[in-house]
């Protein structure tokens, strides 16, 4: 059975999340990696993970969820990380903010990202990275922080061939979402063709980015099947082999 390597459940009520997780195996899923992206959500995920062992949880401050209380949030995060499989999702999102007045916002994202890399090192956790329109700077922060790429997952990977080669050369991991199935998939098909299968994950990023044939609708973790199917076509292997390899990759990276 499949593992959705990256999803969100905080759009659901507690009862809805409980019902969904109770029937996980019926949906063809053996596990989910869910990310709490802001402090208000961490307890929600913590409570769910205590009830459902198949739910593996990451905690982090998403770059677009940084508030004026970011220092308090980092202090709180330190208490949740020991109960997580990774720190995430964290990173940089510079989409649409390249104007002069946005420089303080960009600098704050960089600071909070670097601080969370330090916490991941402190607690010996891998990281799940969100990167949008910021790869050159994010790369420099990873180099400066000396964070090992072997413990980095680039979620919803859409970067170009050059970025993929840089990640591959340093032992990093990438995760493909429903974008891989789109009519206009950007760089994803090219990089998925070339990237080593033993360092690829499949994800939904639900409730966002529903794959074809559900594009435009609310995404759900069971739709990861369509991402795996597309990846199997690209790699010219059976769906069963693709599921086995990507699931093994996910378990190995997150340590379960």
Give each language-model segment a name.
Residues 1-256:
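Mid-domain alpha/beta scaffold segments of enzyme catalytic cores
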